[in-house]
Amino acid sequence: MLRRFLLGILVVSLASMAWAGVPDLVLSQAEIPAGADGALVFSTPNAQGEAFTAAFAPGGAVVDATISVTLIDTNGDPIFLYPFEDLWLETSLGSLSYCSGGTVADQSTDEMGMTTFSNPIAGGSYTDPASEMTMVMVAGAPISGGGVDVQFNSPDISGDLTVNLTDIVFFTDMLGGDFTDNPLFAGDFNYDGQINLSDIVRFTPGIGAACP
């Protein structure tokens, strides 16, 4: 009887050890600061856009849209030193284009299982504020919960990860009020609801930008 009891304990212990360090996508969490819902992060393929700490709220006010992640394993314990390169951002409709490694976490998880996304990303194209969310991917699978409401746009309007003549034409059309090919959001780089000189100032330095 004792032998059978000890064997049962051993089996349970081994099972628990086997799941230790394996992310549980339901228990794990991703969140943004209060007041950052719908914030825009201006991005470029060469990662010279804005940090998440300098995102724009609808209307143009600067807000902190840092994405905080807590990674929990299937035993309910925080995962320490989960590799930052295995944590990255995608968007729910796939609109965000990004370079290899261009949306990875700031660092590997700490002893509390936490890390952040705050650095400028290397990416392009634009998302759909009406229906798209940002997903935190863990080794290729998204954390449950539907994602966080962070949006992106870029001088790389076409999303081919190079800011070139195509993007200049697209931006010029939008500047002139022609939104046939792209919506206003695609060229409203400070999210103030209009395309004007402030957007030209952001677009122009990005010309020629490409993945690192």
What would you call each of these model-derived segments?
Residues 20-212:
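Cellulosome-associated attachment modules in secreted, modular CAZymes
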